[in-house]
């Protein structure tokens, strides 16, 4: 990611500030300079806030970023533009705030834009805070904490990671590399193992419960097996067949006893049943004999009923004749009454028919007028049905005339406009070839002019650079002379005995211990004199002078290096500039020609646009002409249609108005309808009346004939009755009626006789059957048989219950054995499958030779990668003296993340706190850069085209500072834009580009400047 623009509104000390990072050349190192509190770090806060809504350091609350001098009604906002993966994006984030005078919070906003190459505009991608934050995180592939480590190294953050303990490093590395997922994996596996162990223990518990509930059938051997523990699964499996065998033997034994007693019980039940049947048959035989004696006592009365029944049967034919004559006589009387009623009905119908005929004659007198009206209706019916069409024709034909006049007028006006436009177009004599010729001339002139302008600017720039180059060369010459003077001065200083500085006390001690004539312990010669011949004050003075001259010399060498770098840079720029004085002499003339040609082109373009406008208007009016002609044809066609309809209407209806015709048609139609309705009703009434007369006349004749036939039948029945009475011996109709009254009781008499004979026969047959059944058979004592049955049944039930209990116990044992075997099989399979998981869980939770958890192992891997990257720079910065290494230690928890330093001079490891301030800075910077590179690799390979460092360089000496700067310069040359915040003056001299932050105590401003 490479920033291109940052706009801060009401943000910290910036009320409205625009920082254009495109002023920085690619791969450029620049310095951010300003007084303390001017807002340098706020630039980093602005970038981080735009991307993540947070400050650049954890200790700073984003709510404190709003400017104290901001307008109470204006929000704090940041607009940040940047490039990533050859794409441009813009993020606009506005913080929520309470407007002045309001009590409610105005919510924040977030808009994310992407630059579209085709339209050359930023297009909105997200406009909600939650979705926008997700879009940014997906785009960058990192979170805020990782961004701080990758792009921004804030104040105090360098040393924090270096000197922190394992626990603190674990927290930082966990966030950067999301290693919490390994702890979650470890906990997930641990919980899975715990759950699995619980399930295994639960299964052993269920096996124990099932085993303890197994039935032993009071068998001593089985009772002994019950003492087995659920963990002894192999012994349990061996014992199960013994339980099954004992249960099977008991079940077979009780089944045999149950079968024997069941046969005995069935036999006694059959015997009791047969004895009960015999006793009941003897009793039934006695009862039937008594019933037969009682029944035969009614024999005489039955004989009398039989004699009476014979007489009743003989009178039956007479009864039928008698009833037939009575029926005919009743029918005869009814027919006479009906005949009189028919005669009255016929008289009424004839009167009604005459009345209808007179009404018909009156109605027929209107027939001629009705026919005329009916013909008119038939002839004009289609006009009445389509009356709206003809009414519309009468109304529209007048409007049509108006439209035709208007259309003719518009056609004439449009024709005049078309003629005028054609004349105007003909007056404009210009074509595209003229435009193309002038455009080509303008193009050539523009290229020539641009080239001459560039040459003119190059000349000015060359003159400026030449002046600056001469000044720089003079400074180089002067500085070299100063360096030569300093070197000469350094050579002239007396360096004899310079190494004896600070050795005065040591020499005096030696002098006090020796005497003249002694042998020298150093050279071995005889001591001739112990006088003091070394001038220690002069040696110290020379030592200080050498140091002072060396400092001045180093400073001048640095100045010379910077001046030579600047001189080379200016020289390269001068050599790249193209200069030609001959080419720029006529630039004003070319510029004037270009203006003239542009004006000519504009004039021609205006004429072409005017002609195109006239042509467009002409085409429009031609379209209008065509539409007016089409409309005229349609109006004429409609007029012809309307005239045809009107003439047809007048011809057939004899009316000039539709309303009068409609009124007349309705009146005629109503008259005809009423006539037809009345005529149909009368005709219907006449026909119905005639039909009724015919029906009643036919009924009259039928009834007369029926009366004659009934008189003959009644006379014939009377003769037959007299003959039958004479045969039977009856003298009067009274005797006949007495016998006939008894005829009603015939069925009752027959039923009494039949019932008697049926009962007598039934009793006789039953007595014979029972006599045969009980012959030679003697009943036994019921009480004795029942007692025997009770005893047998009691024994049988006892064995049935015992057998059922045994079967139930055997089946329950079988079910429990199946469950136990299922649990055992599951346990064997599960233990075999889970053994590796159990072992893996213990290894991941730290129960291993290294005593490291999975997450700690992963973090150590990342830390060693970071240290490896850091050592590449630290060895160079420390002159191959120092190298970071991870402290090796074995303990539980997050151990092994401490860092110590290996000193190649002493060939020993040292605690990190033993480093000096400058050395600590070197190690911190190297570690921070190494951390940044590893995080970059792990974050999906996001391209780091920029880095900002907010850290003091004041603790470094001259040589260390140079080494640190070389490291940062190499970062720049590797493709990164590197920005540094520092107050060290040497950096201002070494870094030519400065982003200066100035403050007037109320607000701050920024600007880029070159040294």
Curated annotation (Swiss-Prot):
Residues 181-210 form a coiled coil. GO terms for biological process: DNA recombination; DNA replication; double-strand break repair. Gene3D superfamilies: P-loop containing nucleotide triphosphate hydrolases. It holds the Pfam family AAA_23. ATP binds at residues 34-41. It comes from the Bacteria. Keywords: ATP-binding, Coiled coil, DNA recombination, DNA replication, Endonuclease, Exonuclease, Hydrolase, Nuclease, Nucleotide-binding. One of its GO terms (molecular function) is ATP hydrolysis activity. SbcCD cleaves DNA hairpin structures. These structures can inhibit DNA replication and are intermediates in certain DNA recombination reactions. The complex acts as a 3'->5' double strand exonuclease that can open hairpins. It also has a 5' single-strand endonuclease activity. Heterodimer of SbcC and SbcD. This is Nuclease SbcCD subunit C. It comes from Staphylococcus haemolyticus (strain JCSC1435). The gene is sbcC.
């Amino acid at each position: 990611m490479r920033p291109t623009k940052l706009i801060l509104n009401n943000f910290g000390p910036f009320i409205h500030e625009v920082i254009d990072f495109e002023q920085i050349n690619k791969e450029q190192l620049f310095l951010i300079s300003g007084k303390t509190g001017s807002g340098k770090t706020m630039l980093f806060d602005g970038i981080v806030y735009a991307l993540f809504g947070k400050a650049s350091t954890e200790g700073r609350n984003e709510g404190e970023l709003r400017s104290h001098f901001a307008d109470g009604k204006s929000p704090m906002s940041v607009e940040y533009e940047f490039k990533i993966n050859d794409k441009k994006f813009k993020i606009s984030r506005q913080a929520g705030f309470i407007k002045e005078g309001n009590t409610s919070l105005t919510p924040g906003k977030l808009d994310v834009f992407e630059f579209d190459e085709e339209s050359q505009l930023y297009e909105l991608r997200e406009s909600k805070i939650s979705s926008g934050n997700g879009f940014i995180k997906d785009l960058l592939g990192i979170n805020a904490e990782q961004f701080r480590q990758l792009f921004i190294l804030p104040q105090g953050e360098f040393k924090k990671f270096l000197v922190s303990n394992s626990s603190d490093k674990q927290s930082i590395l966990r966030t950067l590399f999301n290693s919490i997922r390994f702890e979650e994996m470890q906990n997930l596996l641990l919980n899975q193992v715990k759950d699995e162990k619980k399930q295994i223990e639960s299964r052993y518990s269920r096996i124990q419960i099932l085993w303890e509930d197994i039935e032993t059938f009071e068998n001593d051997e089985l009772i002994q097996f019950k003492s087995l523990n659920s963990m002894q699964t192999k012994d349990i499996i061996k014992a199960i067949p013994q339980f099954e065998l004992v249960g099977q033997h008991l079940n077979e034994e009780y089944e045999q006893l149950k079968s024997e007693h069941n046969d005995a019980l069935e036999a006694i039940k059959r015997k009791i049943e047969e004895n009960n049947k015999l006793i009941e048959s003897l009793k039934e035989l006695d009862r039937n004999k008594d019933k037969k004696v009682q029944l035969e006592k009614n024999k005489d009365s039955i004989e009398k009923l039989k004699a009476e029944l014979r007489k009743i049967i003989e009178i039956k034919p007479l009864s039928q004749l008698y009833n037939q004559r009575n029926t005919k006589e009743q029918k005869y009387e009814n027919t006479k009454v009906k005949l009189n009623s028919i005669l009255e009905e016929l008289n009424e119908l004839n009167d009604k028919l005459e009345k209808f005929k007179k009404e018909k004659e009156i109605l027929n007198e209107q027939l001629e007028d009705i026919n005329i009206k009916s013909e008119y209706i038939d002839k004009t019916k289609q006009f009445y049905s389509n009356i709206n069409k003809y009414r519309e024709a009468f109304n529209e034909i007048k409007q049509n005339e108006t439209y035709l006049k208007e259309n003719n007028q518009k056609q004439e006006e449009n024709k005049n406009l078309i003629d005028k436009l054609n004349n105007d177009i003909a007056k404009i004599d210009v074509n595209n070839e003229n435009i193309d010729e002038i455009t080509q001339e303008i193009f050539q002139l523009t290229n020539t002019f641009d080239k001459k302008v560039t040459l003119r600017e190059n000349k000015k720039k060359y003159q400026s650079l030449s002046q600056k180059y001469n000044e720089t060369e003079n400074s180089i010459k002067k500085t070299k002379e100063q360096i030569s003077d300093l070197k000469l001065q350094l050579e002239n200083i007396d360096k004899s005995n310079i190494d004896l500085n600070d050795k005065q006390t040591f020499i005096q001690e030696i002098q006090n211990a020796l005497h003249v004539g002694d042998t020298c312990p150093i050279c071995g010669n005889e001591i001739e004199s112990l006088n003091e011949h070394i001038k220690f004050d002069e040696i110290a003075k020379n030592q200080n002078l050498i140091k002072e001259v060396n400092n001045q010399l180093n400073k001048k060498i640095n100045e010379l290096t910077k001046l030579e770098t600047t001189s080379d840079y200016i020289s390269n720029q001068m050599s790249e500039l193209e200069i030609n004085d001959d080419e720029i002499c006529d630039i004003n003339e070319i510029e004037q020609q270009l203006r003239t040609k542009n004006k000519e082109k504009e004039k021609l373009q205006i004429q072409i646009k005017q002609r195109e406008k006239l042509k467009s208007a002409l085409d429009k009016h031609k379209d209008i002409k065509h539409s007016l002609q089409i409309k005229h044809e349609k109006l004429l066609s409609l007029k012809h249609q309307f005239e045809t309809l009107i003439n047809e209407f007048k011809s057939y209806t004899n009316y000039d108005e539709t309303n009068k015709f409609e009124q007349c048609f309705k009146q005629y139609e109503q008259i005809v309808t009423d006539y037809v309705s009345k005529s149909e009703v009368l005709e219907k009434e006449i026909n119905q009346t005639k039909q009724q007369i015919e029906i009643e006349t036919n009924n009259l004749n039928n009834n007369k004939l029926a009366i004659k036939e009934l008189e003959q039948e009644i006379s014939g029945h009377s003769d037959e009755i007299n003959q039958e009475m004479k045969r039977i011996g009856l003298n009067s109709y009274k005797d006949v009626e007495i016998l006939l009254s008894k005829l009603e009781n015939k069925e009752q008499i027959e039923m009494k006789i039949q019932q008697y004979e049926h009962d007598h026969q039934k009793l006789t047959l039953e007595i014979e059957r029972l006599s045969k059944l009980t012959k030679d058979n003697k009943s036994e004592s019921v009480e004795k048989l029942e007692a025997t049955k009770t005893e047998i049944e009691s024994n049988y039930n006892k064995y049935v219950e015992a057998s059922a209990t045994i079967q139930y116990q055997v089946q329950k044992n079988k079910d429990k054995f199946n469950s136990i075997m299922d649990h055992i099989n599951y346990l064997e399979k599960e233990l075999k499958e889970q053994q590796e998981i159990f072992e893996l869980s213990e290894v991941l939770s730290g129960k291993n030779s290294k005593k490291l958890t999975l997450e700690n192992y992963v973090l150590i891997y990342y830390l060693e990668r970071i240290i490896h990257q850091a050592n590449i720079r630290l060895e160079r910065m420390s002159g191959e003296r120092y190298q970071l290494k991870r402290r090796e230690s074995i303990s539980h928890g997050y151990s092994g993340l401490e860092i110590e330093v290996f000193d190649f001079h002493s060939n020993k490891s040292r605690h990190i706190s033993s480093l000096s301030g400058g050395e600590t800075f070197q190690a911190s910077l190297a570690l921070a850069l190494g951390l940044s590179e590893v995080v970059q690799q792990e974050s999906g390979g996001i391209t780091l085209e920029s880095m900002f460092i907010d850290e003091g360089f004041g603790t470094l000496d001259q040589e260390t500072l140079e080494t640190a700067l070389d490291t940062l310069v190499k970062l720049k040359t590797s493709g990164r834009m590197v920005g540094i915040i520092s107050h060290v003056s040497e950096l201002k001299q070494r870094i030519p580009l400065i982003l200066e932050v100035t403050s007037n105590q109320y607000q701050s401003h920024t600007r880029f400047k070159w040294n």
